[in-house]
Amino acid sequence: MSSSVTSKYVLNSFSSVPRLSYAKSIDIKDSLTDLIKIQRDSYNAFIGIDQDVDSGIKNIFQSMFPIQDLLGRAVLQFVSYSIGEPQYDEYECIKRGITYSVPIRIVLRFIVWKVQEVSFKEVKYVVDEETSEKSIKYIKEQEVSIGDLPTMTSYGTFIINGVERVIVSQMHRSPGVFFDSDKGKTYSSGKLIYLARIIPYRGSWLDFEFDIKDILYFRIDRKRKLPVSLLLRALGLSNSEILDTFYDKIRYERCENGWVVPFVVDRFRGVRLSYDLVDIDGNVLVKANTRITLRLAKKLASDGLKKYLVPFAEIQGLFIANDLVDPASNVMIMCAGESITSEHINKLKLFDINEIFILNIDFLTVGPYILNTLFLDKNISYEDALFEIYKVLRSGESPSLDTMKAFFDGLFFEKERYDLSTVGRIKLNDHLGLDISEDVTVLTKDDIIHVIKKLVLLRDGEGFVDDIDHLGNRRVRSVGEFIENQFRIGILRLERMIMDYMSSVNFDNAMPCDFVNPKVLATVLKDFFSSSQLSQFMDQTNPLSEVTHKRRLSALGPGGLTRERAGFEVRDVHPTHYGRICPIETPEGQNIGLISSLAIYARINKHGFIESPYRKVDNGVVTDKVEYLLAMQESNYYIADASATLDENNRFVDDMLYCRHDGNFVMVKREQVDYIDVSPKQIVSVAASLIPFLENNDANRALMGSNMQRQAVPLLKADAPLVGTGMESIVAAGSGTVVLAKRSGIVHRVDGLYIVIRAFDKEKNEYLGVDIYNLRKFQRSNHNTCINQKPLVKPGDYVRENDVIADGSAIDQGELALGKNVLVAFMSWQGYNFEDSIVISSEVVKKDVFTSIHIEEFECVVRDTALGPEKIMRSIPDVNEDSLSHLDDVGIVNVGAEVSAGDILVGKVTPRPPVSLPPETKLLVTIFGEKVFDCVDSSLYLPIDVEGTVVDVHVFVRRGVEENDRSLLIKQNEINGFIKERDYEIDVVSEYFYDELKRVLVNTNTEYNNQNIEDYLKSIPQKSWWDIKLSDESVLSQISDLKEKFDSMIENAHSKFDQKIDKLNYGYDLPQGVLCIVKVFVAVKHNLQPGDKMAGRHGNKGVISRIVPVEDMPYLEDGTPVDIILNSLGVPSRMNVGQILETHLGWASVNLGKKIGNILDNIDELTIAHLRNFLDQVYDGQDLKYSIRSMSDDDLLAFAERLRDGVPMAAPVFEGPKDNQISNLLKLADLDVSGQVDLYDGRIGEKFDRKVTVGYIYMLKLHHLVDDKIHARSVGPYGLVTQQPLGGKSHFGGQRFGEMECWALQAYGAAYTLQEMLTVKSDDIVGRVKIYESIIKGDSNFECGIPESFNVMVKELRSLCLDVALKQDKDFLHDRKINN
């Protein structure tokens, strides 16, 4: 494919180095700017940012109101709604542990009518004589709060009770009609049983199905099945109307020789004649027993055959189309649908019937299914049909006709109880070829009739069943839709409450606010966000895991599938997933295929269907027009692969191309191609698009690679991959972890906590204001990883909108950096890398290459107890001074303190009941004046497995309770931060406006007070510049405008400051009985150690088996020791060859960097030309090549300096470099093209026999850390029933000595050890007390008792009425004495 447009590379200090990319296709990067668009758009559509457009909230209010009381005396109307601003910002909500929400207020109008008379039957209103309308007694209008709505953060998440959560989108079957078959599995004969199902968005399901006898039935909500004729009769159709609806009629006219029938070609196709085919003139055209082909039938028609004769007897067995009555005597000859017999033929002659209509049923193309079903239900009436349906759904009641009719209408035909939704109506219209308005979201009679018709056609062999796994039949429910459904439930509850209140309230005193209880809606929303299966604790391990979680699609959850019942078909990859759902990224366990990820370019349309983008092809030429297609639309077009070769005019080079069409691959001419893929990577998800050489890996390993990248822990120093895919910067920018510039401007000030930018539009030369960015420092994520943002810009830098100005965790220069580039050798080493184990160099640990920071949160709650309040204090009973060394005077640990297991973080005492002292203690107290503590130590201690540094302390004191010194200090620090922000903003605003004022004044070139104006300005304070009065009116007007803008911005800065101070002084609302909460955050440093899990990006995972001294590690010829040794046997069987290609490309990248570094170390004018030429060779065929040629020498040197550690490369998915391209890079770096080198044994210094594959791989440290898993116990808790130690680290349990371990001891004959394991070390209560006493006494003897598990077994046997008792055998004891 042709390369993209050349763009000059602009070097700046804060952007990443552009990658040497092997992409051949033109990327539509606009589609990748917002990776969490799926969440944001859905939520915005619900809340209706633009109130002119119908939104979810607006529609709900309009459907609920107006509400009138039961007698119609008053009405409550909806006028408008408004959404307020959040009380606290996102960070403050996390800190306070509250929900990030906005208040919703609605304006209600309460109208009370004037009435003359009120009775139970009717109300007589007073009518206005002028307008002839009901006369109004009074109107009251009021704005009412209906509760708070959790609102979405700028990152697409929700903060519920201080915790970030994500609402996962759900894949479910689209509303509409579906036709299917049982695939011959129901009956042993293998006969296909066809069925249809109408699924609404809300309401009862309606199923139609055939049985083995081809009788058609229907079910409502999967209840007992009934003949479909009952439903048709309940819809008001008679027998003849039903037959007219489902069958064509054939007119038979009687003549003396038989019946004259119109000749229709289709009726004779493939028919063997049972009689001679004779025209009306008596000519025999075709003899009996002749099979008529389509060709012969068409010839007869073309020869002029319009009508033919049927002998009288041949109508026997046909079905009459309508009731046949003798007009003279009014005698019923035949009923509609009845089969004609010889008796009926005689009656036709007797009553001289000259014309009859026959149902077109030939048993080949048209079957008698509806007719047979009609005869099954014994000709029941409309009322009986309604009763039969009512009886199945509401058994045990005897209803009236009106009740049954209202019930039946409510099932499918009333909006309140049944809703197909717009999507369902579109699908029904599309499926059945109807043209019913999209606003009609209930079923119609036509819908039901057309569904039955199509099902009958399927049984007759016409058409195909639906593929329920086709993405045209599955849609996505996103966050906005979920909240809308919950909102609707809350509003319906509120409506019922309003109706109840209206029936009992005095209207004269009532106001709109009296009718609304805001807690109703809040309760429903809280339940959904807190406990729904699709409202999930956000995976915040690293930026990629955040993005992936927000783009996840789940088939589970309410209204979805269950993992136990989901079959293989629904989990499998479907052809329509191409470009919509990633075929790679899915969990490995029982949820495989049920949880998936949105493809990288896919988007979800307003109806919830997934669209994929394609570039339009016009007569073999690829245009730049991008169109999004649905899965249903895509099957109609021929779509070429993105890797198709184009010439310089964007025309296909090949005459014939492989294309996708209707789920198959076909070869077509280039002129027939309709579309082409926008990119080869459009098939995969965000995580899979980050794996270089994905196409060289087995799919199972690619799946593991995608999933393990989400488990990578952010490291102490982030390092972007040398071999990437080009997606790293896009994922970083879309993750919300980095700080993006809101507006273009010039960086004014930067420190560790703030970036201050003077927003400025260069093109318009317009000042826009001040943007202050607060950086997040050492904050705890949901998964205890560290969130820490570092500024990239420096004062004076010009930044554009959406530039990355600060890195977050696992981000390096605006690129995703989940791991580290390390030197890897593929070889065996002393068996320590057996079974995927990893051998690592001590140098890696020493340099903190894979060290990560984790932040643990510990909470201490101070309560008001029945005996008095608990207190935070430094003087704690029975605790020595050394243990209090980390605490301040208040009793709270100092920030920066190094704490280890058992240290006190918060000193706290709890009152205890007074105890009566013995006389001797009272005497000592009296003599020595010793203080007797009436409280106990309840301090917050650091758990045993934690050691680290205190990085932050939060103190929340209940509003109205006196604050301690520490909380006052923390508050003062926050106020100082607000002051700093305000002063920064005022400084920037003042600097700009005074510069502008000076420019305006100086440009006048006048004198003021007998001085040059510029000199005069220097001599007076800046504030006095505004007071200068000039004679020029235009200059005064300019100064006035500047002053007005300046004052407005300064006032705005002070206003924001005052609001922040007010919120801070407001205090904290804590739970009942809680006086104070102290949260201590401890940063724990995790070094790499044996037992930690590591992985590459290709599914190559392993556990560290040994950390080898650096001097013992194999080393290169130049003495460089390798960092990691991997087992080469881990590659062939796993078929993830991508890791080897990455090794070679990484090896070339680093050595090219070394070569550039060597040139830079000896730089002069000649070598600059050599450097430019060398970079020209490295970036050959790249757009960047032209930028390098035109760079100044200084820019070139700065650019080359950033390539010292390696030349960053991009191997996009399905567009990675070929073998020859990697070989060329290795040659350019003066390396062996095999990618292998001689290695030397670090222990003995000898060269290994064979060359070894060595290179640089991007390795990740996963969050399965040995520190979190390793566990030991000596004394601990026991189970209540079994009296055995509990299991698991969380319960501080023991190690289970299981069945197989017992076998091992039995095999060795270690009887006493076995006895010890099964008794005193397990559940022998008496024995363990005795052994404890023996240990204290220093005695080595112990005695075993009866294990508690034996007693449990005995009791279980007794519960089965089996009395088991232990008896001592006297003879056995006697024999034992004699033997002794």
Swiss-Prot record:
Keywords: DNA-directed RNA polymerase, Nucleotidyltransferase, Transcription, Transferase. It comes from the Bacteria. SUPFAM superfamilies: beta and beta-prime subunits of DNA dependent RNA-polymerase. GO terms for cellular component: DNA-directed RNA polymerase complex. GO terms for biological process: DNA-templated transcription. InterPro entries: DNA-dir_RNA_pol_bsu_ext_1_sf, DNA-dir_RNA_pol_bsu_external_1, DNA-dir_RNA_pol_su2, DNA-dir_RNAP_su2_dom, DNA-dir_RNAP_su2_hyb_sf, RNA_pol_bsu_bac, RNA_pol_bsu_CS, RNA_pol_bsu_protrusion. It catalyses: RNA(n) + a ribonucleoside 5'-triphosphate = RNA(n+1) + diphosphate. The keyword Transferase applies. GO terms for molecular function: DNA binding; DNA-directed RNA polymerase activity; ribonucleoside binding. Its EC number is 2.7.7.6. The RNAP catalytic core consists of 2 alpha, 1 beta, 1 beta' and 1 omega subunit. When a sigma factor is associated with the core the holoenzyme is formed, which can initiate transcription. Belongs to the RNA polymerase beta chain family. NCBIfam families: PRK00405.1 (NF001616), rpoB (TIGR02013). DNA-dependent RNA polymerase catalyzes the transcription of DNA into RNA using the four ribonucleoside triphosphates as substrates. This is DNA-directed RNA polymerase subunit beta. It comes from Ehrlichia ruminantium (strain Welgevonden).
